[in-house]
Amino acid sequence: FLLSLPHLASGLASLVLSK
């Protein structure tokens, strides 16, 4: 789970920035 946090965080940031 902890290892997936960076990936999820970068994914969410990408979605937010794309808007």
From Swiss-Prot:
Where is this chain's protein located in or outside the cell? Secreted
Query: What are the Lysine amide sites (modified residues) in this protein?
Result: K19
UniProt name for this protein: Phylloseptin Bu-2
Q: In which tissues is it expressed?
A: Expressed by the parotoid glands.
Transmembrane stretches in the record are none
Example of a GO biological process term = defense response
Q: What is the lineage of its organism?
A: Eukaryota, Metazoa, Chordata, Craniata, Vertebrata
> What family does the entry list?
Belongs to the frog skin active peptide (FSAP) family. Phylloseptin subfamily.
Keywords in alphabetical order: Amidation, Amphibian defense peptide, Secreted
GO cellular component term of the entry, any: extracellular region
